[in-house]
Amino acid sequence: MEEFRRAYAKLCAAPQEAVLRRLRERGEAPGRARLDLAEQSLSLETCGALGRLLPGAAHFAEVALGDCGLSEDGVKLLLHGLCSNSTVKSLDLKGNNLRTTGAEALGKLLRQNKSIRSLILEWNSLGVWEEGFSFFCQGLGANNFLQRLDLRNNQINHHGAGELAMALKRNASLQELDLRWNNIGLLGGRALLNCLQSNKTLKKLELAGNNVPSDILKAVEQAMDHNRDRQTILSETQNRTSVLSKEILNLKDEKTKQFLDLMDTIDKQREEIARSGRISAGRVSQLQEALNEQHSIMNSLKAKLQMTEAALALSEQKVHNLGELLSATKQEQASMAERHFAELQQQKQEGADREGKLFRDLSASNEKNLFLRNQVDELEKKCKVQQDQIFQLKQDLTNTTAELKLRAVQAEERLEMEKRRFKQSLEDMESLRLKEVDHLTQHMEASERSMQDRVQRLEAIRIALEEELSQVKAAALTERGHAEEELIKVRNQARLEEQQRVEHLEEKLRLMTEARDEAQNCCLKQKQMVGEAQVKANQLNLHADGLRRRIEELQQDLNSKEQEKVTEVNKVKVELQEQIGHLQAERTAQEGLREKIAALERQLKVLSSNHREALLDKEGEISMLMEKLRMKEADISRMKEEEAQRASILQNAIMAYVQGSSLGTHSLRK
């Protein structure tokens, strides 16, 4: 506010002290979003400075310029500055006696400004200048942002009301219009009532103090009630559609998140399967290397077996040589028996000992040969068993690898099938949801259009009935007025005639009294004249009685007309009650439609809950598939552990066999 005050003082050659003091007071006040210069007489220079400052130098939400005595040029400069302003929401210009130039500037402001929501123009006499007010109404019709307009005490006549009605037909944002204490009259009220058939946004229209009939005021109030009900229904439907769209977007986000999580878990499972495949391939390669090592060990065992067979052949050769030596010794003994007979006993003993020793050695060598043969047989059996085990392990390994590959392929196929089925189910559910939403929206739009048509028809019928009622009332009033005028005329005429006759009789009586004084001698003549006068008086009385009877007949006619009027009014009331009953029936039908809308919303909620249950079922199926995958992984890990156990058992058996064979070779060497 201080910057605004300095800018104002800089722009004005002679700034107004009252304006500076008001700006200084407002700058010290806590609320700085309001420019309040009410009841300050602003000069033309001040208006020009404010018009230059308002577009961008100040950020005010409210501008109060009431009772400032603004001139035409000052108003033009101020409103020209507000045309490009985008922060002012409320403008107060009451009590400034705006004229044609001001009205045209207001129309231009309403055409160009897009931020003003409230405009107060009380006590300005805008309706006096028809051209300026028509320009203002054109600007109001082109504006789609103003929500509240105050036009109290502006001397607006029925022509101005017609211009306002034309503007309201084109305006789609104004919600409150105050036209109290103007001169709108019957024609202006009807024009405003007719414009309300096309304007559905106006919620409040004040017409007090405008000489507008009560039936038109009631019709305007009913139209306002219809507009308010329509706005509430539209706001409720918009809120519900926004809530439903948000829920649908949330469901879509949840579905996409769940699908992405599922894809991530599937990718992780694939990675784990690939890693387990790589690990199993590494283990298979390790087992292949172990088999190769076993083959090399078998080759070494075969070489050792050949060596043992060679050693066995050498031992047999030794046995053969020993047999030859035994035969040679026998021959030598036989040849030397003759020469050494003396030494025979001693040599016999020695020979027997040697023979026993040789026989023991021979039996020991035979036993060793048998033991070695048994070991060779056992080794051959063990080799065959190990070959069978190796072959069985190879078959088991190939079977397990084939089963693993088959299970992996089946798992991938199942995953692909589940993906396709899940995608298909998602697409089907999405298409069904879209179809249901479209059907509901179409049904709601059709029902809303039918309701609007019914409301318009009922409003037209109501307006026609009100016009007929007003016409009947006017006709009854005119007839009653005519009857009263005729009765008054008849009464006046009877009174005049009676007065004339009374005056005439009085004159005659006066003449008779004068004649009695003058003509006492003519008593008979006077008596005759008195008799004639009595006869005439009787005739006059009879005529007066006839007039009274005529008056009574006229009174009876008037009473009959009153009764007819009452019957007509009762008939109109009955018809109005019937129309009200029809309107209430239509209202009940509308309530039924609302209940149907609520039922449809409940069905939509049920469908959304079913959709959520289907999603939960899908999540359960996904969890079951995950559990199956986990069980398959557990089976694979168990089979891998069994293979590792078998490999370790085979390795231990081979190591035991190798250790046993090495012990056998060491014993043979010994």
From Swiss-Prot:
Domain of life assignment: Eukaryota
InterPro entries referenced in this protein's UniProt entry, alphabetically: Centro_Cilium_Assembly (IPR052116), Leu-rich_rpt (IPR001611), LRR_dom_sf (IPR032675)
SUPFAM superfamilies listed in its UniProt record: RNI-like (SSF52047)
GO cellular component: centrosome; cytoplasm; plasma membrane
Function field: Component of the proteinaceous fiber-like linker between two centrioles, required for centrosome cohesion.
Oligomer and partners: Homomer.
Protein name: Leucine-rich repeat-containing protein 45
